[in-house]
């Protein structure tokens, strides 16, 4: 009979109260200010302690939930299998189909078709030839997305895939149009929401089809904080929810057709906490409308790695950035993930950069087995507290937007852009002062490197259009100076001016 008596392995190590830890820290600080030395004042609006203990979990109500249980902090599913997503631009349906099939053979199971124009029903057939939609997720985006909706839905019905197809459309007039261009998409204004409501009804029997995508990564790439990205994204999602219900849909019908896309920065633990907080907040938002089905409260999350921190100089570092960002998203339990190719900031991604991007995810899956553990961050004193802090601050900002009439009203008043621009300016200052490090740009540059011919002036020039979100990269100011020098063909000269007291300068 097995001995089931549990041994007390740590009996020789009595628990140490927090007061004792604080006493030791005070001695080590030697009189230095505790708050200034050890407490991190985040741009998100809350402080992070130097350490966390079990007592710091007290009062966190969401800790009792399991993966797949409301409020879905630990995930909307009981597994952590995410889809490996990769996008391609559709110029020729025949060529795009060939490339898509090659991607599927390379481990991708989520295809993104970025359309440059609308496609006919015959062209949609060509594009989707030999692609089995019940097994492969397909996302349509770009200028022609509205025109392909009906041909794609007809294809699903023709094949009898209504119950099994996983297809999403990046129809996002609130962010992709209003927030980026300053105007709603054609036909404009309220008609956009009538059109979306019609598509929700049209796809009611297609459980795996989502017609609205809230493109929150645009906030992150425009320089927002993590809290701002989360609050603004949820606010835009709520705006869709309300507008669709105003068109006569139930909360269940509307919520199940909304997909969220968010960026992932190199802020490793905070990004994990952001997605956990996003699921919790969205679940509570939807629950407030008394849905009939609990599954309507689940947030469907896609993640795409950041472009804000990518650099055109020493670009291979972007591979490392993408890897840590992908890890954050995978651990956080997203539904699908796209790693941005390392050269996307200055060139059309080629076969090599695309292969490296998807192999990052495949390595995390098949070698590191990140898909085998559900919510590995759960129970971490630090990450659970980050989740609570991010959720609390994002909820405050969300309520501010609601008081202003919702996301659209807040954006049209200039509030959203003012917030994001202020955060971007603070980041720019930190980059200039090297408080934010961008390797290869403001820290440890490769002095022998000369920009390749693929790097153009446009790639390092920041667009600044008033009244809208302006995605950019944090390294642009440094890169513009370097590119100017590279193109001039002249070696810059610097005059070293001695200033101050000579005796003090020579003191040893």
Model segments located where?
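Catalytic alpha/beta active-site cores
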Residues: 2-267, 271, 289, 298-302, ...
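Conserved, mostly hydrophobic/aromatic
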Residues: 45, 107, 160, 282, ...
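Mobile "lid/hinge" segments at catalytic clefts and subdomain interfaces of large enzymes
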Residues: 200, 204-241, 323-398
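Short glycine/threonine-rich loop-to-helix capping motif typified by GTGT followed
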Residues: 224-230, 265-277, 306-319, 347-357, ...
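Glycine-rich anion/phosphate-binding loop at the beta-strand->alpha-helix junction
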Residues: 234-237, 260-357
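Inter-helical turn/loop segments and adjacent helix faces that build the functional surface
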Residues: 244-252, 286-293, 347, 371-375
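N-terminal glycine-/lysine-enriched basic segments
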Residues: 309, 341-347, 368-382, 473, ...
